[in-house]
Each structure stands twice: as C-alpha cells, then as structure tokens.
C-alpha cells in the first residue's frame, strides 16, 4: 500500500489521489495479471452497497455510444417495416409507395396510368378471404419445432395469464378459450422446454390470432374427419339456433385430459337415458365422441355448459349438433360402432337406430296409404291441412303409415288430397241427415251432461216468453217457409251474439259476413251447413236482404254462386240474424215483416264478480236442452239405439284386410 507510483504528488487532493490509485490498480491488474490481495477483496465486497450504486448516466455528451443505439433503433424499425409489409401483401394491394423502400411500386412504375384504366378500382383496405388456406386452422399450423427457433409469443399475447401462447398445433398443448391460457398435455417431468426466442412482429401475431379464431370450427371438422374417417356433418343435422331443444345430441370434444375422458363414461350416466361414447387420442389430447339422449330436452347452450364443467374444456373446443334421425348410414354407423370394443354404451338404444338397423323393423315398413290418413282425419274431424299435417306427423313413432308419410316426397299433395276427401265425406254424411238426425248426431259428440235451465233463465232475464220462443224455434228447425229466420234485436252488450254463437257452435253451423257482400261468393258457406248466422246486420245489410235475399228468408230454393264451380241450387238453411236495428218498425223493409220472427233483448248482459257470464251457454247445456225438449220441438224420434245399438257401422274409408294364416 506504500507504492505511490502514478499519483500526482502531495499537492493533489485526497479525491484526486483516490482516483489515481484506482487507475494504477486497474493498469497493474491488466498488465501483470496479479490478483488483488485478500484484504482488497474484502474491501471491495464491503464497499458494494446502496451508496455506491449509480443509477444516473452522468457520462459526458458525445462519447460515441448514442450513435450505436440510434443505429440499433433504425435497424429494428427497418425489420419491423419488412415484417409488417410481408403480412399486408397477403391481404391488401401494394401501395404506390412502399414503407420499406421509398421507391414506387413496380406495377405503378411500369405503367403510371395503369390504375386509371382499370374497370373496377381495387380497395386499399384489407378484405376477409372467402376461403382460407387449409393449413391455417389455428393460425400457425405445421410449425417445425426442431428445424428452427420458435417465435417469441409474449409480445403479441393480449389476454394470457402466464405470458405464453401456443404456437404449434402438434406440440401437445391445448389453447384455452378467450383468455388464451394454455395447459401442458405432453408428458415428462413437468419442465417447460427451452426455446430460443427471436424478435416477432406484433401485427403479424395479431392477424394470425384472428385467422385462428375464425377458422377454429373448420379445423375441428378436419381433425374429426382425420380421426374417425368420416365427416361430422354426415352424422348430424344442423340447428341454426342455440336455443332449440332436443333430446338427442351428438357431441365431439377435443383436448380432454385422459383421466376426465375415462371418467365421463360414469359422470354422464345420471343425466341421460342413453350414452354412446368413443375416446381416441390425438396430438391435442383425448378426443371424445358421444351420442347422448338426455332425460329432458336441452338446447345447445345447456349441453355445452354441462360438458364444459364435466370435462374442463372450453366450449370453443366442442362440436354439438343433433343427430340425423332418418339417415340409414348414420344409424348404421352408431349401430356398428356400438358393437365394437372402441365404444362404451349405456342405456337402451334409441328407437330411430333400431328402426333403421333391425331386420324386423325393416320388414314392418310399409308403403304409404292415403286411405288411412283420410280415415284419421275423418275420425278426428280434421279438415284443415296444416292441422292434419302436424297431428299426423306426431304419430310417426307409433304408426307405420305415418312414418311412411314422413318418408315420402309428396307430403303436401297427400295432405291436400286427404283434407279434400275428408270434406267430401263430411258433406255427404251431413246431406243424408235431416235436422233431427243432425241434432242427435251433434249431441253424441258432446262429452258429459249439462243443465238446460241456464238457457231458459237467460231468455227470461231478457223478458222473452219461453213458450212463444219454443214455438218459433220449432218452426225454425223444421224449415217452414216464412218461418226459417230468427232475428234477435236489442242494444249493444245484451248477449245477442253470445246466445246465437253458442247455438251455432253446438249445431256446427257457419257464419256469413256482410262485409264480403261485394263478392259473388259470400253466401257459399251456406251450401255446406245445416244452420247459418248473420251477425250484426246494419241498415245497408237489411236493404241488401230486402233486395236480394227474400227467397232465402222464406226457406225456399235459392241459387248460390261458388268459386271455380257451377252455380248450386239448394234450399237455404235456417238463418239467425243479430241486429241493433228493428226491421219491423221501418217502412223501407215492410216486405220482410212476414219473413222474420223477432225477439228483443233489452237488458245488459249479466256478469259475475269474477267477470264470467252469469248464465253459462255451452255445448253440454244445449245438448241437455234439446234432449229435454225433444218432443216439444217436434223432432223425429231416433231409433232405439240404447236398446238395439247403432243400426249401422261407423263410416270406414279403409278397405278391410284378410286375416293372414301362419
């Protein structure tokens, strides 16, 4: 420590001597290579502390280091421009000036007016491609991890929790849902493999991430076909809405843990009546294919949430659709794989698989018979095409003819023909009955017995004498000329329409409206009815009746025009009319006075405290009314059906079948 070589002398300050000493020590160490003594090491270790750590760059300006730093920044910016330009060239036309080099683009340089003579100007913005490349399923597919360094994903990761992102489709990792969290699928000691990072462009990573998200379903469909040997769409039918419910669902889940893939075979059983499960391994993990029949109908969202909880897999890694119920190849696939050792089956096989695969069910299939459909429509009194199509389709699971109807390509024609034939049969059946037989026939269709007293009490409430009403009603039903029209007159809200509509509903009549009087066919419904109703006749309507419908009120033969048919001559059925105008008091309609029988409803319609009608007029009460006053109304006595049974068999439009001997 006595060596003072290299110092400036005694006249130097202590600080300058210290600086000189350290300089000498550094020179000696570099020249001779001698290591400092142990006490010097101890002093240096002791001097290392917070007081000697310098965080401020107090170097003099112009020492030359900022030049290298500026050069590095320029080189990095140039590399970034090259990477961004490489990505943009895939999705947008080249601009006139390139950001990489300030030279004009070659196409503009060769022909400056080339852009002006184009028929359609190309947009400068990036466009979404209709068909993506097949190797861009997850954005970065088929990246060889052994041939070169991986890209550093940290700078382009936006939603990860650990700062990592899966860059290889076959690396044994599974990318999570929206957050992008990855989980190690590969075996080993749990340590992450060391990769050499290189600088990556943020814009390129963002575009690749978007491509991966938009092509995710296509990638899953491709992986399914690669593993199972057939397309996923061959087994399913598509539901556009995720809210549509169904009992049967086909689910394919990718990237499942091995333990959970085996455990789902037991976990799914309490929720379903049938489960067909196949488990295969792939580079993403385990792939689980399931055909599940739940105990209750579920929609796609409910199924996805339930399986996501059981399998710990995001919903974006699932393909969920209902199965094809009428596809023979699809049913045969589930049937054959159920017998192999690669599947685990729980529960009873669905009937749509059994029906298309079992020999017995195949032999039971028959051709569609229109007469059976007509018989069904006749028995259930269905003449509306939409109602018949819906109700008959519901029988497909239990009725072979209904199943054949659904398998036919002429369903609309069959429905139309069946309704047409049913209307013909109904019209012919009605035409052969007189009024007494028709009333008895309509009464037999009513279930239960009612009370006739509310009808009488309602008439007395309006001060209508029951005996005169009964006499007029008797001649009305018999169709006696000049007595076949009943008019119910009174102010509003007195129950006129309520009374007439209840009677019309029991007798199966029709309603005609004066609003359609401009048409020549507005009286056509009267051709197919036993009784008619003209509700709320106004003064214009009475003038029309007085001018054109006197014969109809008489109950005589009239001629009715029907659409696309010849004119029909028939006896006009009895007619009920409700009105707020008294036709008997107006001299304009004096010729109608002898043709109508008028009853006045004076009082307001009575209601209970709950808002229900005080007097109930339903089919059961009208049935009891007619049965009670059958003799008073001079209706013909029906045959002794209660003692001798029905004299004729029910109508059948289906041919009889001979018993087949074994």
Curated annotation (Swiss-Prot):
Residues 464-614 form the SF3 helicase domain. Residues 28-60, 160-197, 637-662 are annotated as: Disordered. Its EC number is 5.6.2.4. Phosphorylated. InterPro entries: Helicase_SF3_DNA-vir, P-loop_NTPase, PPV_DNA_helicase_E1_C, PPV_DNA_helicase_E1_N, PPV_E1_DBD, PPV_E1_DBD_sf, Rep_E1_papillomaV, Znf_lg_T-Ag_D1_dom_sf. It comes from the Viruses. The modification Phosphoserine is found at residues 94, 98, 111. Residues 199-365 are annotated as: DNA-binding region. This is Replication protein E1. The gene is E1.
């Amino acid at each position: 420590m006595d060596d003072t070589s290299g110092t400036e002398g005694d006249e130097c300050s202590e600080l300058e001597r210290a600086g000189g000493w350290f300089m000498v020590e550094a020179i000696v160490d570099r020249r001779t290579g001698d290591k400092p003594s142990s006490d010097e090491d101890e002093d240096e270790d002791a001097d290392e502390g917070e007081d000697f750590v310098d965080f401020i760059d107090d170097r003099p300006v112009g020492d030359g280091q900022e030049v290298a730093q500026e050069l590095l920044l320029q080189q990095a910016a140039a590399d970034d421009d090259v990477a961004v330009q490489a990505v943009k060239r895939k999705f947008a036309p080249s601009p006139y000036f390139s950001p990489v080099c300030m030279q004009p683009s070659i196409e503009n340089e060769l022909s400056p007016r080339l852009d002006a003579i184009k028929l359609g100007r190309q947009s400068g913005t990036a466009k979404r491609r209709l068909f993506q490349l097949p190797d861009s399923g997850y954005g970065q597919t088929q990246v060889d991890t052994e041939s070169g360094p991986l890209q550093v994903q940290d700078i382009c990761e936006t939603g990860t929790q650990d700062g990592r992102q899966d860059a290889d489709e076959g690396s044994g990792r599974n990318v999570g849902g929206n957050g992008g969290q990855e989980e190690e699928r590969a075996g080993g000691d749990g340590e992450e493999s060391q990769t050499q990072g290189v600088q990556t462009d943020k814009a390129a990573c963002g575009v690749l991430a978007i491509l991966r998200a938009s092509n995710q379903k296509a990638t899953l469909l491709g992986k399914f076909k690669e593993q199972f040997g057939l397309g996923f769409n061959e087994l399913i039918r598509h539901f556009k809405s995720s809210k549509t419910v169904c009992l049967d669902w086909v689910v394919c889940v990718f990237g499942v843990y091995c333990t959970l893939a085996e455990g789902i075979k037991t976990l799914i059983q309490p929720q379903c009546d049938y489960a067909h499960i196949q488990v295969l391994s792939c580079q993403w993990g385990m792939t689980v294919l399931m055909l599940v029949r739940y105990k209750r109908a579920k929609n796609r969202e409910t199924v996805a949430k339930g399986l996501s909880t059981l399998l710990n897999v995001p919903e974006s890694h699932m393909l969920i659709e209902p199965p094809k119920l009428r596809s023979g190849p699809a049913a045969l696939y589930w049937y054959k794989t159920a017998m192999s050792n690669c599947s685990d089956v729980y529960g009873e096989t669905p009937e749509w698989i059994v029906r298309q695969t079992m020999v017995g069910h195949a032999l039971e299939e028959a051709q569609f018979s229109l007469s059976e459909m007509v018989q069904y429509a006749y028995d259930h009194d269905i003449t509306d095409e939409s109602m018949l199509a819906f109700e008959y389709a519901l029988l497909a699971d239990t009725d072979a003819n209904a199943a054949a109807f659904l398998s036919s390509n002429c369903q609309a024609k069959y429905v139309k023909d069946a309704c047409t034939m049913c209307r013909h049969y109904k019209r012919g059946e009605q035409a052969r009955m007189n009024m007494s037989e028709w009333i008895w026939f309509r009464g037999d269709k009513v279930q239960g017995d009612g009370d006739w007293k509310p009808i009488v009490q309602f008439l007395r409430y309006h001060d209508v004498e029951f005996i005169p009403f009964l006499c007029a009603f008797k001649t009305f039903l018999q169709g006696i000329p000049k007595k076949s029209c009943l008019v119910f007159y009174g102010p509003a809200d007195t129950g006129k329409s309520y009374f007439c509509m209840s009677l019309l509903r029991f007798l199966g009549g029709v309603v005609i409206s004066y609003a359609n009087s401009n048409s020549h066919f507005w009286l056509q419904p009267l051709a197919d009815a036993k009784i008619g109703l003209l509700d709320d006749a106004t003064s214009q309507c009475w003038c029309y009746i007085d001018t054109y419908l006197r014969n109809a009120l008489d109950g005589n033969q009239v001629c009715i025009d029907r659409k696309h048919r010849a004119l029909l001559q028939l006896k006009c059925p009895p007619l009920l009319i409700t009105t707020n105008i008294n036709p008997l008091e107006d001299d304009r309609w004096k010729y109608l006075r002898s043709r109508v029988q008028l009853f006045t409803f004076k009082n307001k319609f009575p209601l209970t405290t709950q808002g229900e009608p005080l007097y109930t007029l339903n089919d059961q009460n009208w049935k009891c009314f007619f049965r009670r006053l059958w003799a008073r109304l001079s209706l013909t006595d029906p045959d002794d059906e209660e003692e001798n049974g029905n004299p004729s068999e029910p109508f059948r439009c289906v041919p009889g079948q001979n018993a087949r001997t074994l």
